[in-house]
Amino acid sequence: MADADVIVVGAGLAGLVAACELVERGHSVIIVDQENAANIGGQAFWSFGGLFFVNSPEQRRLGIRDSQELALQDWLGTAGFDRPEDHWPREWAHAYVDFAAGEKRSWLRARGLQTFPLVGWAERGGYDALGHGNSVPRFHITWGTGPALVEIFARRIRDSVRVRFAHRHRVDELIVNAGLVAGVRGSILEPSNAPRGVASSRKVVGDFEFRASAVIVASGGIGGNLELVRKNWPARLGRVPDQLISGVPAHVDGRMIGIAESAGAHVINNDRMWHYTEGITNYDPVWPNHGIRILPGPSSLWLDANGDRLPVPLYPGYDTLGTLEHICRSGQDYTWFILNARIIAKEFALSGQEQNPDLTSRNVRDLLSRVKPGAPAPVQAFVDHGVDFVSATSLRDLVAGMNDLPDVVPLDYAKVAAEVTARDREVANRFTKDGQITAIRAARNYLGDRFTRVVAPHRLTDPKAGPLIAVKLHILTRKTLGGLETDLDSRVLKEDGTTFGGLYAAGEAAGFGGGGVHGYRSLEGTFLGGCIFSGRAAGRGAAADIA
């Protein structure tokens, strides 16, 4: 006898969206998750709430001309699909861009979404028109950040009589009868009162079995499992980093992807991952090895561990994967930003809802305080307390402080000074051969960047802009770009291309759709949207198939 119509494995954003779609169509759902109720929303709760919209009213009000055609050009140029198994990821890419240019915004707003009026410009590229990057700003921030986005869906099912949450239930096996998935088996973990994101006990106190007509895997990726990240590290990126910090909680362990694969599901593109190169150690950690990502403006001077400037166009915020590959091939696991107080005040944001309390709490008064002189309070807290930050009034003292940090290659002051001096000479007038200075000036053509995000070019060593600041940047794990292969209804496929009856996948476990809708790279603002779009498809697909 079935325990519910559908079992959803994972209480993150994709799972919540899928459950909402099922409940709206009259189906009963069990949501199984290995963590406690405090972790509903998963990684999405911790996020900045960035969403990729195309030709939105917010864009148009800021003078941004966007279109479905331009967005698809950017997506395909960024994804770089080049494998036979990219058939469904490519289909998902076309469908997702259509969604982002079509009903995505209105569909979310009908459910309560509000967005911040300024649009961010992430992954700017710096190559040609058919290459990687966003041609225009498309990063829309949820008013209320990740928690507000999660709540849009959580509140729709929290008290529903059709939904049962089975927390602290860890799935260990898919039940397969006559080639069809018919449920899940697993272990009941001991109760936990651990706060959200804190690693919880894995002590088993019992077992369970749930049966249903369909199972949706929405369990997330591998970003919290550093062993699995290293195992899947592709040779094309160079050596596997020795030093990694974690951008997601420990429960993001990738177990369900392997469990589904063992049952017969096809996993593709597991060598494609999205890890950030601007990670800093959290001075107030929540989970093990907790790192935070800097969302940088384009003005910081970026040096490798040996003091050499990163090549064109590896500027802050331009090409995450290209920068990651360059770092890994440099022989070291970290890099440096050199900047000053003027730059950090305007150009440093920190990813995550807890690092943006004004946006998260939707406090307009606190938000307006960002226009005051000085860095935002969360950023200043890292300057004051972060182990990766150095401040000094002279470049010589700054380099000495950088060399005092643990686990660094000693920098030669003359080499660093030569890079800084050469860069500073290029801002003396409105002409330059320096690509980064040209990029900064181009960014300031966008009203949102000019007033809130990008400082006017000036000398790093200008005493009026000081003190000087250096930041040691680590590689920060985050997203799994490959995963369970699915069709456009989120049905999981077998290796021979046929559907695996009764099994669906959504969110990061499915590579955000199809087993890798992003290809090799992301345009940003696409992960939450990918969870929403694929979760919606999974809920609708399962509902249609069991009707």
Curated annotation (Swiss-Prot):
Top-level EC class: oxidoreductase
Record keyword Electron transport present: no
UniProt EC number: 1.3.99.-
InterPro entries: FAD-dep_OxRdtase_2_FAD-bd, FAD/NAD-bd_sf, KsdD_DH, Succ_DH/fumarate_Rdtase_cat_sf
Knockout or disruption consequences: Cells accumulate a small amount of 4-androstene-3,17-dione (AD) and 9alpha-hydroxy-4-androstene-3,17-dione (9OHAD) in the first 24-48 hours of cholesterol degradation process.
Claim: Cytoplasm is one of the keywords in the record: no
Cofactor: FAD
Alphabetical UniProt keywords: FAD, Flavoprotein, Lipid degradation, Lipid metabolism, Oxidoreductase, Steroid metabolism
Pathway: Lipid metabolism; steroid biosynthesis
Gene3D superfamilies, sorted: FAD/NAD(P)-binding domain (3.50.50.60), Succinate dehydrogenase/fumarate reductase flavoprotein, catalytic domain (3.90.700.10)
Biological processes annotated in GO: lipid catabolic process; steroid biosynthetic process
Domain of life of the native organism: Bacteria
UniProt binding sites for FAD: 5-36
A GO term, aspect molecular function: steroid dehydrogenase activity, acting on the CH-CH group of donors
Pfam families (UniProt xref): FAD_binding_2 (PF00890)
Family: Belongs to the FAD-dependent oxidoreductase 2 family.
Known role: The low activity could be due to different substrate specificity.
Protein name per Swiss-Prot or TrEMBL: KsdD-like steroid dehydrogenase MSMEG_5835
Protein's organism: Mycolicibacterium smegmatis (strain ATCC 700084 / mc(2)155) (Mycobacterium smegmatis)
